[in-house]
Amino acid sequence: MRQAIAEEVSRSRGVKVTSDEVVVVPGGKPIIFFAILALAEVGDEVIYPNPGFPIYESMIQYAGARAMPIRLQEEKDFRFDVDEMASLISDRTRLIILNSPQNPTGGVLSKQDFHDIAAAIGDRNIMVLSDEIYSRLVFEGEHYSIMSVPGFQERTILLDGFSKTYAMTGWRMGYGVMRSDLAAHITRLMTNSNSCTASFTQVAGIEAIRGDQSSVDRMRAEFRRRRDAFVAGLNRIKGFSCRMPKGAFYVFPNITKTGWKSKPLADALLEEAGVAALSGASFGEFGEGYLRFSVANSLENLNQALGRIDAWTKKNL
């Protein structure tokens, strides 16, 4: 399994990876947890995207480190200002978490963004945790990794997995790629907590990663079709304004013109319209004023959801 992953990451990121630089884990979260435990302690600082995957902040706080949010900006298609990130770096910064494509916004960092981030970090003793779990779900352009920036392979912990690319969520299979000395310590954390990733799921993972990839291409095309339809529909609804996400399978509309806070609106849409969305505030302080919808559903159901949201807004706004 580790050899298959090493071959795939070497090919897709344009770097040389060996099997002793790969740690296989049951899902992506253990890599987030172990990386933060390994690199940050009380008094240290970790910079992370906000709004972002809630586990980042909770894991940082669990380790006793200080969580330093970097705001994803709607006007920049939910990328962040690299100068703002640089201003957060201090002599206590141990780790910077990047996520592209992003959950919940669908934002994608550009190749230039990654090179600018690398330049801002410079020669400081700071590691990067690059969450690339949606790497195969980029709709415009090509996925790029900070691991591919010259000089940054040894400073990057790459997180990827099978849940999103191969729709294998329940199989619980993810992996981290990092320099071999750090991989040995992360493996020790894995061994003493989860023992191992189930062997039969690893066999399935090998088949997925080495097999025919046409299903991945078809799924990406279908997600793009659903994204296009759902964003267009939301932008026709009173109070909603939605940018076109460039990756993942979420849309993240701005709902400030509805006059509602995100949590009450999400609750009302669920209870009164039968449409499930997550409050943007669930993803951090800078997520207020937004909702997250998933397009991992049929186009028929997504169109039905749009109709229900539209009817609810006409009645309540």
Residue ranges of predicted features:
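Glycine-rich loop-to-alpha-helix module at the N-terminal edge of alpha/beta enzyme cores
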Residues: 4-7, 11-12
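PLP-dependent class I/II
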Residues: 11-317
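Generic hydrophobic, aliphatic-rich segments that mediate packing or membrane embedding
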Residues: 1, 5, 28-31
